[in-house]
Amino acid sequence: PRAGPQDLLSADGYLFTTPENLATMAGLMKDFFDRCYYPVLGRIEGRPYAVMVCAGSDGSGAVRQIERICTGWRLKSVAPALIVNTHAQTPEAILAPKQIPPEDLQRCRELGEALASGLALGVY
C-alpha cells in the first residue's frame, strides 16, 4: 500500500527519504507530496522531520524541494539533510544497482535513530 495523508496525520515525525533523479526528488516521492500536501495542510504543524537523499553527484536539488514543502507544512527540521553520494556519472553506473558503503548506511541509521530517540524522549 502507498503512504498517504492518514499516515502523515498518525505519525509524530517524519524521515523523508528519496533518490535524486535529474536534480529533483524521485517521481514517486513527488507523487506522495502531491497527494498529501493539501489534505494535511494546517494539521501537522510543528512536527519534526529530517531528510535523506541518495544522489549520483549532488543531491541538493531534491533536498531543496523537500525542504520547501516542509516549510509550507510548517514542520520543524531537526537535523541537516543527509546526502549519500554514489558518484554514478555514466549511463551504466546510473542504471546499475547501487552498493551503499557501510559508513554511509551507518550515517543513515544514526539519523533515523536520532529522530526516533528525540521523539521517544519528548525532545521534539
Question: What are the functions of these language-model segments?
Answer:
Residues 3-85:
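Helix-loop-strand module that forms the ligand-binding subsite of alpha/beta enzymes
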Residues 3-4, 78-124:
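Glycine-rich phosphate/pyrophosphate-binding loop and the adjoining helix
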